[in-house]
Amino acid sequence: MTSHPVFIDLSLDEQVQELRKYFKKLGAEISSEKSNKGVEDDLHKIIGVCDVCFKDGEPSQIDGILNSIVSIMITIPLDRGENIVLAYCEKMTKAPNQPLGKVCLQSLWRLFNNLDTASPLRYHVYYHLVQVAKQCEQVLEVFTGVDQLKTQFANCPPSSEQMQKLYRLLHDVTKDTNMELSSKVMIELLGTYTADNACVAREDAMKCIVTALADPNTFLLDPLLALKPVRFLEGDLIHDLLSIFVSDKLPSYVQFYEDHKEFVNSQGLNHEQNMKKMRLLTFMQLAESNPEMTFDTLTKELQITEDEVEPFVIQVLKTKLVRARLDQANRKVHISSTMHRTFGAPQWEQLRDLLQAWKENLSSVRDGLTNVSSAQLDLARTQKLIH
């Protein structure tokens, strides 16, 4: 979302006077005269009635009024501005419809970008900004990822408690429209806990696991097991279910579902979607150790019919998690490569061996080219001596 700098030609006193007159004309309970207590008291009273303009005003006109209020707010010293900013943010969440919600969103974004980057007030503005963005379906305009979020607060990082609150909100506003982003937010949330307070993050840990399992684009689930709050769930059904998705095959999930059907459903997880994901994960695991698989093997391991094998493999190839070739004539699937479901010490050793082999091959090529080059130089010198 773009934001324009705030520039108002009138003096602060003139702006305050005009705003008071405007809101009084709309029927707000406010005096048209300036406060003798100063501009901060004026702002408190103006902000207290500013939502009156939501009733009948045009969005473009309201945007101008809110812009004027913001231009005054950003002049207030930090130590005296917190209550004013919080009151304004709260008013911006009261927009009665989506068009006005977008106006309020733009106003908060303008305020956020005109505050000093080292101001702790930016956190509070951004939190309300996300709330308003949800109301008018503009979340991705203000939040595109965790890295972008951290960059915005680089000069004044919020406390761990504040970030936990913000991550929970971001999870809530993205879970229905972007599960992959929502899952990343929850993983980041769990990363804010330490060994000392991980035990109190039970609810967050469960949400994180459920979000990751439900996300159709999240397949590498092994890192979740290393998160401290997730470790505290060991022995719980949700941890057992996660472990199945991390390293077990489809039959293990089927058995778990038969034994704990009510639990799975109570978590908001869709059994058919779980089956679809577990089939793909099972196929990946089989591909790690089998360069070729018969259709018979796949029908047995994936619990599908032979007619479903080809469509299934095509769907797997679309994910780009596995590179393979269908051999319909011989009823086989030839595997070229696959992403590992888990990436532990064995995988690091395999990667090390692969890189070492590449290094040795490159050294052999270099030595060969050096020998060829030397031979050509010797030949050239010999021919020169002959002539």
From Swiss-Prot:
Range of residues in the leader sequence: none
Main location: cytoplasm
Lineage: superkingdom: Eukaryota
Keywords, ordered alphabetically: Cytoplasm, Golgi apparatus, Initiation factor, Protein biosynthesis
GO cellular component: cytosol; eukaryotic 43S preinitiation complex; eukaryotic 48S preinitiation complex; eukaryotic translation initiation factor 3 complex, eIF3m; Golgi apparatus; investment cone
Any one GO molecular function term: cysteine-type endopeptidase activator activity
Keyword Cytoplasm among UniProt keywords: yes
Domain PCI: 181-340
SMART domains, A to Z: PINT (SM00088)
Segments passing through the bilayer: none
Matches recorded under InterPro entries: ARM-type_fold (IPR016024), COPS7/eIF3m (IPR045237), eIF3m (IPR027528), eIF3m_C_helix (IPR040750), PCI_dom (IPR000717), WH_DNA-bd_sf (IPR036390)
Localization of this protein: Cytoplasm; Golgi apparatus
Cytoplasm is among the record's keywords: yes
GO biological process: formation of cytoplasmic translation initiation complex; Golgi organization; protein secretion; sperm individualization
Function statement: Component of the eukaryotic translation initiation factor 3 (eIF-3) complex, which is involved in protein synthesis of a specialized repertoire of mRNAs and, together with other initiation factors, stimulates binding of mRNA and methionyl-tRNAi to the 40S ribosome. The eIF-3 complex specifically targets and initiates translation of a subset of mRNAs involved in cell proliferation.
UniProt subunit comment: Component of the eukaryotic translation initiation factor 3 (eIF-3) complex. The eIF-3 complex interacts with pix.
Family of this protein: Belongs to the eIF-3 subunit M family.
HAMAP family: eIF3m (MF_03012)
Protein name: Eukaryotic translation initiation factor 3 subunit M
Gene expressing this chain: Tango7
